[in-house]
């Protein structure tokens, strides 16, 4: 395909590689908690979006991860893919986040280690990126919203709840459901949101 990188192709999954990847995501790992892809080019770690310059709705999660990694593990730049690298459409990173709901990252490993006269070993950068991946895997539980209902009050026709989020991800589609002992749904709330960094009422 001779289209520029901002063109997603003739149709969705027009390339066999992206089609196979979407099948894998949907049929093998539909409930994954983390998705990582690797690429060579420059040294940077990218999160969604590649297609749009706006920050994702879970920007608090990605900024938290960036700050933790840069403060304690590596000085690898961590950016929104569109702003940090260039606009890029049709990536598994954007599909995994936007459609499947995974936290997703692309690790770009620069190719300077392959140049003649380089003083950096190929394994140095890869080792550092492996440390970052290890951090992401060891803390994977926190990359989702983990809601705890601290208090529920029912007064007349109103239900009030206090919710804490133990994870670092926001959610916009939490609901409160009420079932009887037979498992029959008697009532459910509208969707409500809980940010990653607050206690909601």
Label the predicted regions:
Residues 157-161:
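Structural beta-strand segments of beta-rich domains
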Residues 176-180:
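Conserved aromatic beta-strand anchor motif in extracellular beta-sandwich/beta-rich domains
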């Amino acid at each position: 395909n001779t289209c520029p990188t901002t063109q997603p192709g003739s149709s969705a999954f027009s390339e066999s590689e992206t089609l196979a990847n979407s099948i894998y995501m949907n049929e093998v790992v539909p409930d994954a908690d983390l998705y990582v892809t690797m690429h060579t080019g420059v040294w940077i770690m990218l999160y969604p979006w590649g297609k749009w310059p706006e920050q994702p709705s879970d920007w608090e999660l990605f900024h938290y991860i960036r700050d933790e990694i840069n403060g304690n593990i590596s000085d690898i730049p961590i950016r929104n893919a569109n702003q940090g690298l260039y606009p890029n459409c049709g990536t598994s990173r954007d599909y995994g986040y936007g459609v499947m709901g995974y936290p997703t990252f692309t690790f770009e490993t620069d190719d300077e280690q392959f140049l003649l006269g380089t003083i950096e070993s190929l394994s140095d950068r890869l080792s550092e990126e492996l440390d970052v991946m290890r951090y992401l895997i060891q803390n994977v539980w926190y990359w989702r919203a983990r809601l705890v209902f601290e208090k529920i009050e029912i007064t007349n026709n109103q239900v009030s709840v206090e919710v804490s989020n133990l994870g670092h991800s926001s959610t916009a589609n939490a609901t409160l459901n009420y079932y009887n002992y037979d498992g029959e749904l008697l009532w459910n709330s509208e969707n409500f949101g809980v940010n990653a960094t607050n206690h909601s009422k």
